[in-house]
């Protein structure tokens, strides 16, 4: 076969570094708004096709047979990557933990929900070193069970089985994590080097929305902050990072101690002898990274990071040895063979087994971050309680592990499988099931008529429905209109929701709800959650009619109302918008530009660029949110394309307003008359070439009917974003 490569031409598709492919738009204009990010998870990249239903496939899985195969794998040590202590349990616990542990509550991104550990950058993070071996060990099982188990589910289930095979009783397991087929572009930090920490400002203030202390770590540096072996300083980092993963102090202690009851770390030799990570490896390495030149490169010679620590006397069995060792010994600072800071027990006898030589014993060892659980006052109190009450420790770890591995799955309606726990947990954002007949088309029409006759304005109806539904995050499937939590703390008090106006609208709607429900003889009811969305639909229909179009906004009942007791106020405050560009709202504390916040919010709502564009145009003329800017129409509360027509009108000249950052005024080019005011978010649709192209479509004279149709479709998508029962 002739393998000669012609060098005279170049492939027209961009590959490789900038020097090989030429400079892209973002290279020339690094501050350019990235709209393409809205078109990730494109179905074109999915080999399964549009009709594939993963949850349905999972239900066909021989679940017990799969678990049996996983149990057998735990002790089936392979020559190419031998199991520590003859058991892969510790490796697979770490794999599952690191799959889930990227979750961050600030924006709901990261986590185990899509199997992203298979892709860059996560597959090549320093903290994920040698987890490529864990995934390769799983491949024969994944190959056997095929599409009935996703990689995302398999990672977590394998972690559960690992715990069970080592004598621990887990809280349960839910399947339902469908794989994605390309790496998700996320902001993991500003650094350009592994383990960089430019993410801090001031007195060690970690930038939002980040949840780890250094680039390429899951949480904290196990040697201490920037390698400083100070357990108290490390405790601060631990508390910060674990809280950003939605864990409190008790859950944090349970997770660290529970995870470190098993397995070991690997720092057998000089880290400079480790080869490239998977994404930087040679073609013939076939995606395996971190090839080591130290000794055999595996087994007793394994180098994964710096420390060389085995925490307990029974690293393949559940025990309370972690806490017993932590408190029964005093600790002195030492270094691993790799030169990393770690701690060894003083005046102790060797009692820790060797991972590969049964004739050897070692001194108990700990990481700096382990000692934080003893020397931080709050952590110590919890740790001593767990030391004295092993049953409480086991229960806390089981629950915290379940939360860790399921936090980004959303409500329980998305859970599938025979081991789904029956207990409702408050972090699952519990919504009661429907227990009554639902409204029919005639009821819907009657209720719409009452809403319109109530005197509530289009702006009030649309704003309330949007406020209720737009909290949805496609990242961790939280928020949305279902549950009607807009009426509960904390959402009812958020500034972005205009509490006084919100209370007025909800009072009227609650009156209609009570009147309707009291008048039914067969138990039929409408929830406030449904009525809020229905009222918004009525408002949109009225606005469309005012714009010259008769439309019916689709409405599907079936939402229910959550209680305040089912709502964790602190947890829901994480959903509070710092910016909602759809309502032209901007709070004081920002970590991105307003137009970037627009794209970020659209991405969380799973909107495409055209959907985002049409919603902005419609919501502006309906005066949703902050009406003082961006209402580019002389006919407000009518659903028209005026926003785009007037934004793109060359008779208007825009200029920034002195003393009002991010606010602009549009004046008549000839007379200087003030016509409009707008924000950066408004003007981006005339400035950004891709968004301007979309705005031009909706500003055309022949597009008015399509504009209304597209707005209704995008509106309905947001209203139903959390209706997993409709999928």
Curated annotation (Swiss-Prot):
There is a cross-link at residues 97-219 (Tryptophyl-tyrosyl-methioninium (Trp-Tyr) (with M-245)). Keywords: Heme, Hydrogen peroxide, Iron, Metal-binding, Oxidoreductase, Peroxidase. Its cofactor is heme b. There is a cross-link at residues 219-245 (Tryptophyl-tyrosyl-methioninium (Tyr-Met) (with W-97)). Formation of the three residue Trp-Tyr-Met cross-link is important for the catalase, but not the peroxidase activity of the enzyme. Heme b binds at residue 260. One of its GO terms (molecular function) is catalase activity. InterPro entries: Catalase_peroxidase, Haem_peroxidase, Haem_peroxidase_sf, Peroxidases_AS, Peroxidases_heam-ligand_BS. It holds the Pfam family peroxidase. NCBIfam families: cat_per_HPI, PRK15061.1. Belongs to the peroxidase family. Peroxidase/catalase subfamily. Homodimer or homotetramer. This is Catalase-peroxidase. It comes from Allorhizobium ampelinum (strain ATCC BAA-846 / DSM 112012 / S4). The lineage of its organism: Bacteria, Pseudomonadati, Pseudomonadota, Alphaproteobacteria, Hyphomicrobiales. The gene is katG.
């Amino acid at each position: 076969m002739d393998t000669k490569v012609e060098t005279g031409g170049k492939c027209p598709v961009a590959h490789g570094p900038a020097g090989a492919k030429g400079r892209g738009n973002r290279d020339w204009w690094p501050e350019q708004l990235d709209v393409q990010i809205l078109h990730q998870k494109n179905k074109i990249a999915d080999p399964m096709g549009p009709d594939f239903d993963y949850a349905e496939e999972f239900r066909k899985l021989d679940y017990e047979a799969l678990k049996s195969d996983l149990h057998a794998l735990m002790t089936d040590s392979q020559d190419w990557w031998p199991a520590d202590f003859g058991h892969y349990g510790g490796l697979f616990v770490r794999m599952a933990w690191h799959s889930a542990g990227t979750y961050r509550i600030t924006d709901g991104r990261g986590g185990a929900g899509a199997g992203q550990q298979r892709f860059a950058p996560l597959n090549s993070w320093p903290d994920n070193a040698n987890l490529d071996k864990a995934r390769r060990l799983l491949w024969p099982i994944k190959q056997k069970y095929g599409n009935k188990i996703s990689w995302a589910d398999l990672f977590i289930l394998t972690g559960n089985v690992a715990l069970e095979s080592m004598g621990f009783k887990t809280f349960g397991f839910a399947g339902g994590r469908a794989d994605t087929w390309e790496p998700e572009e996320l902001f993991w930090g500003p650094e350009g080097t592994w383990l960089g920490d430019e993410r801090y400002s001031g007195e060690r203030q970690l930038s939002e929305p980040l949840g780890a202390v250094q680039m390429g770590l899951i949480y904290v540096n196990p040697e201490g902050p920037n390698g400083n072996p100070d357990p108290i300083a490390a405790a601060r980092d631990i508390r910060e990072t674990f809280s950003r993963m939605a864990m409190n102090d008790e859950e944090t202690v349970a997770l660290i101690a529970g995870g470190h009851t098993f397995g070991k770390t690997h720092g057998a030799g000089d880290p400079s002898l480790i080869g490239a990570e998977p994404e930087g490896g040679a073609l013939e390495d076939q995606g395996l990274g971190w090839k080591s030149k130290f000794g055999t490169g595996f087994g007793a010679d394994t180098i994964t990071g710096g420390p060389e620590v085995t925490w307990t006397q029974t690293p393949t069995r559940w025990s309370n040895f972690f806490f017993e060792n932590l408190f029964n010994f005093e600790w002195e600072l030492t270094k691993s063979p790799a030169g990393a800071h770690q701690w060894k027990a003083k005046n102790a006898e060797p009692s820790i087994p060797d991972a590969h030589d049964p004739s050897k014993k070692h001194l108990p060892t700990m990481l700096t971050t382990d000692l934080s659980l003893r020397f931080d006052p709050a952590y110590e109190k919890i740790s001593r309680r767990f030391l004295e009450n092993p049953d409480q420790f086991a229960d806390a770890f089981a629950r915290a592990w379940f939360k860790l591995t399921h936090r980004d799955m959303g409500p329980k309606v998305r859970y599938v499988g025979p081991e789904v726990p029956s207990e409702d947990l408050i972090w699952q954002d519990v919504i009661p099931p429907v227990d009554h007949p639902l409204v029919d088309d005639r009821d819907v029409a009657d209720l719409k008529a009452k809403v319109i006759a109530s005197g509530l304005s289009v702006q009030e109806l649309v704003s309330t429905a949007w406020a209720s539904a737009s909290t949805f995050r496609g990242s961790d499937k939280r928020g949305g209109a279902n549950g009607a939590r807009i009426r509960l703390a904390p959402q009812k008090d958020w500034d972005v929701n205009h509490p006084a106006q919100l209370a007025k609208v909800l009072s009227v709607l609650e009156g209609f709800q009570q009147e309707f429900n009291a008048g039914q003889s067969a138990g039929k009811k409408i929830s406030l959650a449904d009525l809020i969305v229905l009222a918004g639909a009525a408002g949109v229909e009225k606005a469309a009619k005012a714009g010259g179009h008769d439309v019916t906004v689709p409405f599907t009942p079936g939402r229910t109302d959550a209680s305040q007791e089912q709502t964790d106020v602190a947890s829901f405050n994480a959903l509070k918008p710092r910016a909602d560009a759809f309502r032209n709202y901007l709070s004081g504390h920002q970590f991105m530009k307003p137009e970037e916040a627009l794209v970020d919010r659209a991405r969380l709502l799973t909107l495409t660029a055209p959907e985002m564009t049409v919603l902005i145009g419609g919501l502006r003329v309906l005066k949703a949110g902050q009406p003082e800017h961006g209402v580019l129409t002389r006919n407000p509360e009518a659903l028209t394309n005026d926003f785009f027509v007037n934004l793109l009108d060359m008779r208007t000249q825009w200029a920034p307003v002195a003393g009002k950052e991010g606010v602009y005024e549009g004046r008549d080019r000839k007379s200087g008359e003030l016509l409009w005011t707008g924000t950066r978010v408004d003007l981006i649709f005339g400035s950004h070439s891709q968004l301007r192209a979309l705005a031009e479509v909706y500003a055309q004279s022949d597009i008015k009917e399509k504009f209304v149709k597209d707005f209704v479709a995008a509106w309905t998508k947001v209203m139903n974003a959390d209706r997993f029962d409709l999928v």
